[in-house]
């Protein structure tokens, strides 16, 4: 499989001037144990070195052509790498390029020597050719070349690993109109609707949900841990309604519905610009003693990107639009933020849009605008008040060239809360994962990728419950969701359907087999 993949990509790589040695090491070295590996690993690089994919295509030519621009991007994003790290990366790349040129020259000479030897053998008998001074000189030169090449290959591997360990942490380029700074510098580009007015003090979504018996978050630490929740009755129907409403709208607009794996290899995460082996990380890792290098996805974006990994899209199908509803898993390591409620939870349902376009900013920017318009349309039909933000440099992460967030008003919280995000990743992800398209002339080129939240269910639920609450405790259902709930209002049950009978309560009910005095 590795050999066939190398044959597939080699014409493209050769045209781009990138050389991959194509050595599959999976049969030469045993797999290293995740349990014993202590150094910081680059799973995407290892994935390629083991022969599963080609080495990520680093656009180091652009970095070296304008190092000041690359350093400026590092400074503005305030990420893991700083401008002071850039010279070492450039130096390593230049050293590796020179070494590979030396190897190429020696290998070409070795092939020429071998060809000359074959010609002599074809024209003379074996006994006679052994005495030929030209033959002896060629054999001596061949041995000398092999001796020169022997130490160069491990040097190449060492430099290559050193380069990828650092260069894969370089961020994407940044849109010139992106605000500079942290999230406080986000630019409001649009406001939709008005804040709902109440004749009473609005309640938070958790209080509303508990009184309506549609959300349960209490007494779950021994069941599913902190930051977990149940949705019941109308709460569950709201979730299903939001998913079906969103999917129906997007499928009618030409999106292809997808389901994706929840468990994915670390290389796919890193190809998307995420770091599953960081410490701390928001990504859940499966026990490596049983399943090496599997992680729970925090967004369907990873699975959708993995679907296109090492594949080319037909030119006539561009732009490709995909939509997927999935369960997302996030560690939410900063437990000091939003410890209760549905705003920050370990698992939730989300509908995600993902697009693949041809090259050039014009096409991917148009698709980003389209995704953003769909987000606005969905939230408007749900009757929410929200604002669209152009996110600043420190909020872009590694992959985003430009990013827009939408924050919905949440009256119970008394502030806006993020409900969607949309990012143009240009060719950042496709260069790492080899997401490509085939032109009408049969040429392979890197595609652009765009991703956007269509509906993050728990946060939209917060906005809906808090914005549509009534004085009597009921909640009005938006017209767009009424067909899925079969009602226009959610009301409290007439009795208590489930009563806690466990320990740690003042008046514990008597269980079977217990005496009244116990």
Curated annotation (Swiss-Prot):
ATP binds at residues 330-332, 345, 418-421. Residues 497-518 are annotated as: Disordered. One of its GO terms (molecular function) is serine-tRNA ligase activity. Pathway: Aminoacyl-tRNA biosynthesis; selenocysteinyl-tRNA(Sec) biosynthesis; L-seryl-tRNA(Sec) from L-serine and tRNA(Sec): step 1/1. Keywords: Acetylation, Aminoacyl-tRNA synthetase, ATP-binding, Ligase, Mitochondrion, Nucleotide-binding, Protein biosynthesis, Transit peptide. It comes from the Eukaryota. It is found in: Mitochondrion matrix. Ubiquitous. Gene3D superfamilies: Bira Bifunctional Protein, Domain 2, Serine-tRNA synthetase, tRNA binding domain. The modification N6-acetyllysine is found at residue 110. GO terms for cellular component: mitochondrial matrix; mitochondrion. L-serine binds at residues 299-301, 352, 453. The modification N6-succinyllysine is found at residues 195, 337. Its main location: mitochondrion. GO terms for biological process: seryl-tRNA aminoacylation. It holds the Pfam family tRNA-synt_2b. InterPro entries: aa-tRNA-synt_IIb, aa-tRNA-synth_II, aa-tRNA-synth_II/BPL/LPL, Ser-tRNA-ligase_type_1, Ser-tRNA-synth_1_N, SerRS_1_N_sf, SerRS_core, tRNA-bd_arm. Residues 1-34 form a transit peptide. Homodimer. The tRNA molecule probably binds across the dimer. Belongs to the class-II aminoacyl-tRNA synthetase family. Type-1 seryl-tRNA synthetase subfamily. Catalyzes the attachment of serine to tRNA(Ser). Is also probably able to aminoacylate tRNA(Sec) with serine, to form the misacylated tRNA L-seryl-tRNA(Sec), which will be further converted into selenocysteinyl-tRNA(Sec). Consists of two distinct domains, a catalytic core and a N-terminal extension that is involved in tRNA binding. This is Serine--tRNA ligase, mitochondrial. It comes from Mus musculus. The gene is Sars2.
């Amino acid at each position: 499989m590795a050999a066939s993949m190398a044959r597939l990509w080699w014409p493209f790589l050769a045209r781009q001037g990138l050389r991959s040695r194509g050595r599959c090491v999976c049969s030469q070295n045993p797999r290293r144990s995740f349990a014993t590996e202590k150094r910081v690993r680059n799973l995407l690089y290892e994935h390629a070195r083991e022969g599963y994919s080609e080495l990520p295509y680093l656009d180091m030519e652009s970095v070296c052509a304008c190092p000041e621009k690359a350093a400026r991007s590092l400074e503005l994003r305030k990420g893991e790498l700083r401008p002071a790290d850039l010279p070492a990366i450039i130096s390593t790349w230049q050293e590796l390029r020179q070494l590979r040129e030396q190897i190429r020259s020696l290998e070409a000479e070795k092939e020429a020597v071998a060809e000359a030897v074959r010609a002599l053998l074809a024209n003379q008998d074996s006994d006679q050719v052994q005495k030929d001074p030209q033959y002896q000189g060629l054999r001596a030169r061949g041995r000398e070349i092999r001796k020169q090449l022997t130490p160069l290959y491990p040097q190449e591997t060492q430099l290559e690993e050193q380069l990828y360990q650092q260069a894969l942490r370089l961020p994407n380029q940044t849109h010139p109109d992106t605000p500079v700074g942290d999230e406080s510098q986000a630019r409001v580009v649009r406001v939709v609707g008005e804040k709902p007015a109440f004749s009473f003090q609005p309640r938070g979504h958790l209080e509303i949900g508990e009184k309506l018996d549609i959300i349960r978050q209490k007494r779950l630490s021994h069941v599913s841990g902190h930051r977990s929740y149940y949705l019941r009755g109308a709460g569950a129907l709201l979730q299903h309604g939001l998913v079906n409403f969103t999917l129906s709208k997007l499928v009618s607009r030409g999106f292809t519905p997808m389901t994706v794996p929840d468990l994915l290899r670390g290389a796919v995460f890193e190809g998307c610009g995420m770091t599953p082996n960081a410490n701390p990380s928001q990504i859940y890792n499966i026990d490596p003693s049983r399943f090496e290098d599997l992680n729970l996805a925090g967004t369907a974006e990873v699975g959708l990107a993995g679907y296109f990994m090492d594949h080319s899209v037909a030119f006539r199908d561009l732009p490709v639009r995909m939509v997927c509803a999935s369960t997302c898993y996030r560690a939410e390591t900063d437990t000091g933020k939003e410890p209760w409620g549905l705003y920050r939870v370990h698992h939730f349902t989300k509908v995600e849009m993902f697009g693949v376009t041809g090259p050039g900013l014009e096409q991917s920017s148009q698709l980003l605008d389209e995704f953003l318009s769909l987000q606005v349309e969905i939230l408007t039909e749900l009757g929410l008040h929200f604002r669209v933000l152009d996110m600043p440099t420190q909020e872009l992460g590694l992959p985003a060239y430009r990013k827009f967030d939408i924050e919905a008003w949440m009256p119970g919280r008394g502030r806006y809360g993020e409900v969607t995000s949309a990012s143009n990743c240009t060719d950042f992800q496709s260069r790492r994962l080899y997401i490509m398209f085939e032109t009408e002339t049969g040429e392979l080129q890197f595609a652009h990728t765009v991703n956007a939240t269509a509906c993050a269910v728990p946060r939209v639920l917060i906005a809906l419950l808090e914005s549509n609450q009534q004085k009597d405790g009921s909640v009005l259902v938006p017209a767009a969701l009424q067909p899925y709930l079969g009602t226009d209002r959610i009301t409290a049950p007439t009795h208590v359907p489930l009563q806690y009978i466990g320990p740690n309560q003042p008046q514990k009910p008597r269980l079977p087999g217990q005496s009244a005095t116990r």
